[in-house]
Amino acid sequence: MRFRIVSSKKGKVCSLPCEACYQPHISKIVTSILQGKPVSFVLPAFPGKSPNPSKVLGTLPDMAERYSLVFLNDLCKSIEKIYPPGAHILICSDGRVFSDIIGMKDADITAYQREIDAIITRLDLTNLSTFNLDQLYTGQDFDCMRQELLDVFGQPIALLKEKVRRGANEYASREDREANRMYSGITKFLFEDALFPGQLKSRNEIQKDAKVRAYGVIQRSNAWSNLIAGQFPEHVRLSIHPQTCGDLKLGIRLSAESRITPWHGVALDIGGAITLVKRHEAEKLAAQLINDENGRPDYYKL
C-alpha cells in the first residue's frame, strides 16, 4: 500500500491498514496464495503520449516510460520477498479505445504499443505483460473495434451525464461520486492537452470542448474497464487514478516520487535521481535535453 493513491472526501483519508480497502481484493489474493501462483494485477495504462508538445518529447515511449515500467516490475519483485511466487501486472493499454476523441493518431498508438512491448522484452521485465484492443478484435479496422467495444460493454452518454450530475451531491452513492470525480479529472486533462503553442481557440472554448469530449472518453474508458473485468476476473484491479476507501480498484503511482504519468510528462535526472515532470517544467529549469543512442530526445538532466 506504500505507493497507493487515495481520493479523500472532505479531507478525510482512510488509515492503513484499512479492512474496507482490502475487502474487495482479499479473496483474489488468497486464492492465488492457496494455489501457489503469483498474485495477478491488471492495470489500464500506457495509452500513448499526450498530443501536447509542452508536456512530452514526442509520440514514442522514452525514459519516462522505461522508468515507470521498471518501477512496476520492481514492485512485483518486492512482493517476492514476502511471497516467493511474487506478482504479475498485466498492462491493458487503452490508447486505442479513445484515441480519436483525444487527438491521438492510431498510427502513433500502434508504434507506442509496440515500443512498450519492446522495452519490456529488452529490459527483461518478466513481471509485466500487455493486452490491448487490437489483440481482442483482430481483423477489424480501428473504428469498428471501438464501436464493437461500445456496443457490447458501453452505456449511453445520457446515463453517464446523470451519474455525473448526481455525483456532485453530498449524499451521492459511491458509484455516482466516482463518475463525478472522474469527469472532473478527465476534463482537466483534456483542457491541459489542448493548451499548446499555436492553437487558436480561447481558454473558454477549450474548456467547453473538454467538458463535451470528457463524456466520450469516460464512456469508452468504462467500456474498456468492463471488458477487462470480464476477461480477467481473477486479477486484482489497479488504476492510475485515486480511488476512495473500499473501491473495486486500488489507485497506484507509476513512480515513487511523482504523481505524473509518463505519457503526460518527461523524465528529469537530478543528480542521478529520476522524477517525472512536464516538459515545459524541465525546460524552465534549463535542464539539458539528452538523446538516446538513436539520436531521439529521451530525457532531461540537471
Short names for language-model regions:
Residues 248-302:
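C-terminal regions of proteins
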Residues 1-69:
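N-terminal regions that are enriched for targeting/export leaders
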Residues 64-84:
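Histidine-anchored nucleotide/phosphate-binding helix
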Residues 29, 71-78, 115, 119, ...:
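Charge-rich, solvent-exposed alpha-helical interaction surfaces
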Residues 36-54, 90-98, 130-137:
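Short loop/turn segments at strand-loop or loop-helix junctions that form parts
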Residues 31-38, 80-86, 232:
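Flexible, charged surface loops at secondary-structure boundaries
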Residues 95-259, 269:
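A substrate-binding/cap region within the structured catalytic cores of diverse enzymes
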